[in-house]
Amino acid sequence: MHGFVCGQRSSFGAVTKATGPIMMVHFDYYPKDLPRIHALEHRLESAIKLAGVGELGETEFHLDGNDGYFYMYGPDPDRLYVVVSPILKSSRMMTDAEVTKRYGSRTETFVIHRGGLQ
């Protein structure tokens, strides 16, 4: 896996970075989408900060394909998802994105669909 990290967001201290992200969003992108992805990052970061549910971490883009990842940190993946899901669902780029929420050693993974499912 080859990639690069775009931006290291850090609006809160070390929330739970020692144990890794509690939520990851895997999405497809094309290089022409980067400005829209950066705008989406700003919306996510603002909403997470305003709600006080954690922080948006780094965004990763794989150089050998069109895979992108948002990493999010905080104490409760469910509260975090409640805050970010309307923003993710509003973006066509996030249609069919895969969300993984971590609960300690257990994970829950599902796909974002436009039109209300998950």
For each predicted feature, which ranges?
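Short, extreme N-terminal segment that most often corresponds to the first beta-strand
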Residues: 2-6, 10-32
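Short, intrinsically disordered low-complexity segments
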Residues: 52-83, 87
